[in-house]
Amino acid sequence: MLKRCTAILLTVLISLASGVAVGAQGPQEKFDQAAIDKIKEEGMKHSQVMDILSYLTDVPGARLTGSPNIKAAQNWAKTKLTEWGLQNAHLEAWGPFGRGWSLEGFSASLVKPNYAPLIAYPKAWSPGTNGVLRAQPVYFDAKTEADLDKYKGKLKGAIVLLSEAREVKAHYEAPGRRQSDEDLLQLANAEPPVPGGPGGGRNFRPTDAQRAAQALALKKWLMLQDEGAALVLEPGRGDGGTMFVQSATLAYPQDVPRDKQKTVRDKDAPAIVPQVVVAVEHYNRLIRMIERGAPVELEVNVSTKFYDQDLMSANVIGEIPGTDLKDEIVMLGAHFDSWHSGTGATDNAAGSAVCMEAVRILQRLGLKPRRTIRIGLWSGEEQGLLGSRAYVSEHFAKRLGP
């Protein structure tokens, strides 16, 4: 599949970089069929795309922006681009992004009434627990604002289960499938999302019930911080072995303006409660045991490290210079960073590997595009497209609006 993606990308790149108008009407330059055939042969018979993907996911592994892992992966990518003969391969700084973070050690277990390891993972930028915590957990089962009073004085130093059990539905069909031509045509012809409606992106307007749930969740987080909980456990999204683990929560009262709020990445961010996501199947079991009155006891240890000496991040950049139209640039790129709890294979080492393989093939064949082809491997995507936006702002145009 990645070989096919590379072949498609290369066809478009060569078309744009050589001056061939893709799908245009009227006179146009002819395709260099010999070059296309060479690209296909190199890509299908001598592909390195899976080796690139394997290295990124197996050796550096998770590539959280600001972490030692992503810096090692970026240096490797820059070195490979240079080895392949790309010009001006470098790490281009942007930021400030904020402090880096890495997980140094972690364990989580049910120890009473019987032993069982828990499938769980700390959230990014969570502090550590300063050693092993062993205690009976507190189930923070506040379903209304009035319920919060029942937990005053009970959360200090506690391991807290943040919310109720989440329903896990049975899967009777495969979660993934290959799209047919009819499916793709239907997607292509679909009406664009209406702002404020379903699928309307940032203009989506929550319902009254959703706003109430968000307000209650905020009050719970503020209470956890104020009371001094020792650790928060949350049910993970996903099921059947899939967990989604993102950034730790730093809650602010609603009356604090957004521009006055820190993020967990900020060097001077206020202290927060250590936070761990638990696989929903294991989390639900803990809730059921507590509701049955079982003497549940947990043992958790979280060890993390922050890196605040250098608050900048970087993108990996390299290019194949053009000839007579070298001042015109054809960009290809993919986000290089990932979250920390997996190896970031599909999101997005796959895309990064395809882009790297595309420029490798062009260099290997010695093709001379008219326009400059530039590759960008972006960081900070998972925190809001930060790296690519910084690059566009620096080299092309400032973004208008929020």
What are these regions (language model features)?
Residues 32-35, 112, 117-120, 124-150, ...:
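Soluble metallo-hydrolase cores and metallopeptidase-like ectodomains found primarily
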Residues 51, 59, 361-386, 402:
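Short helix-loop-beta-strand segments that form the rim/entrance of peptidase-like active sites
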Residues 393-402:
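A glycine-rich helix N-cap at a beta->alpha junction
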Residues 8-18:
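Bacterial N-terminal signal peptides
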Residues 171-189, 234-279, 309:
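Surface-exposed loop and adjacent secondary-structure segments within mature catalytic domains
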